[in-house]
Design a protein with these regions (language model features):
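Terminal, non-globular segments
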Residues: 1-199
């Protein structure tokens, strides 16, 4: 039983890494509004590097952030903290963001959810969605606040708001795909994790 659960966990970790590689590769492609290296004349490098081609283009939702939060609500044992921190740190570097800042914010948010896994198990999707919206808002505000304090350049506020709204709207879709395509669900009462411990 334990070996089967460990195998299942490994499969989901590899699935997460595969999706992360795919999404990151897509974000680095020179596609209008969705990747690095494309934008209207005069677009500043920061907006382009973060997937923002300009005010007339839609920024890409943070799919991997949605995936991390959705999986953390359902099966926190599948995403160890080093995996989350490592991926988002690499993403910071590849997308030319301040290294470590967004990774730390994401890690804090996911560990917040991990510490409340027992309570989250009883949440319906409506309550879960409200919690995630509040958490996403806190994350984006914290990121902008820290960048403002250290006087680091950051994306236009309008683009950040569009990015936030896109991520909020993408969350239910990510949850649906995780449930129907990947078979990811909240554990039943009394179900144990890969170490034989109750959730």
């Amino acid at each position: 039983m334990v070996e089967r659960r460990q195998t299942q966990r490994l499969i989901y970790v590899l699935l997460f890494l595969g999706l992360a590689a795919l999404v990151t590769f897509y974000r680095l492609l020179p596609l209008g509004g969705y990747g690095v290296g494309h934008g209207p004349a005069g677009a500043d490098d920061l907006n382009v590097a973060n997937g923002y081609a300009g005010l007339t283009s839609l920024p890409m939702p943070d799919i991997l952030l949605c995936l991390s939060l959705a999986w953390m609500v359902r099966r926190p044992d599948l995403l160890p903290a080093p995996l989350i921190a490592g991926y988002f740190l690499l993403e910071d570097i590849l997308l030319l963001r301040p290294p470590g800042l967004w990774a730390l914010i994401v890690l804090t948010a996911t560990e917040f959810l991990r510490s409340r896994r027992t309570q989250l198990r009883g949440y319906g999707f409506g309550l879960e969605y409200l919690l995630i919206i509040g958490l996403l808002l806190a994350m984006f505000l914290a990121n902008r606040a820290v960048l403002a304090i250290v006087m680091a350049p950051q994306a236009h506020l309008g683009l950040s708001l569009m990015h936030f709204l896109g991520t909020v709207l993408a969350y239910p879709l990510v949850v649906a795909v995780s449930h129907f395509a990947f078979g990811l669900r909240k554990p039943a009462t009394g179900e144990v994790d890969s170490l034989g411990q109750k959730y």
